Amino acid sequence: TNIYMVKVPYTAWAGNEASPVEVKDTYNFLDGLEQRYGVEELGTRERQLFSKLNSIGKNEEALFYQATDEMMGHQYANVQQRTHGTGRLIDKEVTHLSKEWDTKSKQSNKIKVFGMRDEYNTDTAGIIDYNSHAYGFAYLHEDETVKLGNSSGWYAGAVHNRFKFKDIGGSKENQTMLKLGIFKTMSPVTDHNGSLQWTISGEGYVSRNDMHRKYLVVDEIFNAKSDYTTYGVALKNELGYNIRTSERTSIRPYGSLKLEYGRFGSIKEKSGEMRLEVEGNDYYSVKPEVGIEFKYKQPMAVKTTFVTTLGLGYENELGRVGNVKNKARVAYTDADWFNIRGEKDDRKGNFKADLNIGVENQRFGVTFNAGYDTKGKNVRGGLGFRVIY
């Protein structure tokens, strides 16, 4: 008597639950998994992955479901959110150069080298928490007119941001972004002190990303790697009024609106096991913000000043940055796309606080900054060195 063992198709485990987003999502991934079965030669890492899956016993369905979930590329869920956040690092440093450091001449060039640590936490199922460490530089060229409060110029920045995901495998992503922009600041003719200022700016960016996705299958970590490009443009309007309360203190209430559009190209993992292909997608940001800044200056020595600024603000994302509906499929198969669950765009808004402490003179400065966002319980801190000439 001959006994034949027949492998049950992986699609038989798909179930009827809407997971991660729609009912067909798990089926489409498992269809790709089934198509990859037996493609790679014996002894390869992908064949070892299938051996791990096939070793799962009848009463160990939870292990199979966990392995399936691990392989489905949750790291690509909030690509747009991470890109948007990296761009804001440059924005923050350019703003510091523009507003926090007094210009002593009608034409100035300001450069700042900075490092920043960030953390993102969420309770949304399928979204992985992460830490990030960034370093880069910002440059600002400004030409002031004879009238106080009127100026124009351009700025540039570059940042390298390293993300470390808090998943089981310890996935990583590196992003390098370049940004270039122009701005113009105007003050009413009747405001001789230049206290009321309207600033309009436009910018564009491009970035290169390298993803190293690591995931657990039964009791072993497998991986896949990809690289991809993102790009975008933005327009910002800001209205602020500087109130000098004493020789050393000032208050600046402000309001702003920033519009941004960004997109990443299609992603196809080139190496590793159970490689995925992610469909290119975009995001748009519509972000109004209101806030107030408190500034204190204390002379320390000849031409040297201690400066501290506390900023309190409220912003609300009205665009589509988190719940972006990214899609993926198993690469090198003709399996259909499955959805990757995105972050909630809950419209709750974000209260933020930023503290900057620095020592500066007419040429050099050093600053320490720390901040907190209520949305995402985001804690950040950084250190910067700057020079003006």
Can you annotate each of these PLM segments?
Residues 49-243, 367-380, 384:
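Outer membrane beta-barrel translocator domains of Type V secretion systems
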Residues 179-181, 274-389:
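Outer membrane beta-barrel transmembrane domains
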